[in-house]
Amino acid sequence: SEVSVAQYRGRLVSLYQLAVTVGFLGAYLVNFQLLGYSESHVVSGIGLFEKIFVAEVWRGMLGMETLPALLFFTIIFFIPESPRWLILKGREERGLNVLQRIYNSAEEAMNQMNETKSVVSETKSEWALLLQPGILKAVIIGVAIAILGQFMGVNAVLYYGPSIFEKAGLSGGDSLFYQVLVGLVNTLTTVLALAIIDRVGRKKLVYYGVSGMVLSLLLIGIYFLWEESLGLSSLFLLVCFLSYVFCCAVSICAVVFVLLSEMYPTKVRGLAMSIAGFSLWIGTYLIGQLTPWMLQNLTPAGTFFLFAAMCVPYMLIVWKLVPETTGKSLEEIERYWTCLLYTSP
C-alpha cells in the first residue's frame, strides 16, 4: 500500500491475495498429480525417489514447496523500501527517489513527500500514538476483522476441502479434483476482484460478498443435514462450495489486506500491521486446529452453520465502524482516524 498510487492501491495490494490463490491452486494441482502418480505406480524398489513420490507421497507434496519458497526469497531483494518509512526516518532523498519512480513525475513526487512530512510532523512517538483513542479504535477494528474473517470458514474450506468432500462420500481422487476446481474459481474470482475493487469500493464488495457467503454456507449446512432425505448429489455440494469461494474471493479475501494496509498512520503502520497480521495468523492457526474437531463434534452441518453466524458481526463492523477508503490517499485516511481532518466514509 505504501508504494501505490491511491486510485490503483486496491488492485495493487490485492495482487498479494492473487498470489496466495495462485499458490493454493498450484499446490492443489501438484498434489492431485502426485497422488495420481503414486496410485498408478507400484513400489518396485527402495530408492529415494520411489519412497518420496510413491510409497510416502506426502513427503513429495511437502518437498515441492521448496521451489516457490526459494523464488519468494529471491524476489524480496528487488522490493523497494517504503518511501513513507524512509521519510519518517529522515532519509528524504532516498524516499523522494522511490516516489519519483512510482509517480513518474518530480512535481507529484515532491507534493507527496511534502504531504507525508506534514502528517509525520503532526504525530507523536509510535507507541504513544498507538494508544490514542482514534488510532486504538482502528487497531481494535483491524484485529477484529482479521480474526473474524478466519472464522467465516474460508481457510477451513481451503485447508480441509478434500476431507469435507470425503465426508460427503467422495473418493480421495474425486475430492482432490473438486478441490482443484475450488482453487481455480478462487484464482479467477480474485482476478475479477482486482478489476473492480477500486471502482466498486471496499465496503460494497464486503456487503455483496458476505451476503452470498451466508447463503452458500447455509446451503452447505442444509446439504449435510438433510442430504439423504432430500436426495441431493455431490454436485449440489460442489456448486455451493464454488459459490461460497466466489463470494469470499471477490469480497473479504480481496479486501482484508487492502483495508489493513490502509487503516493506520505512517508512524504506527508497521506496529499496527504487525498486530493485525499476528491476529490474522492466530485466527488462521485456531481455525486450522479447530476445524477437524468441529467437523467431528459439531458435525459438518453444525460447522458450516457456525461459519454463517460468524459472518454477521463481521458485516456489522465493516458497516458501522470502517470508513470507505477507496480513492483516498493514506494521509486522508490517517487524518480520519486521528480526527485531524474528518472525511465522511
Indicate where each model-derived feature is located.
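Short, well-structured alpha-helical segments
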Residues: 106-118
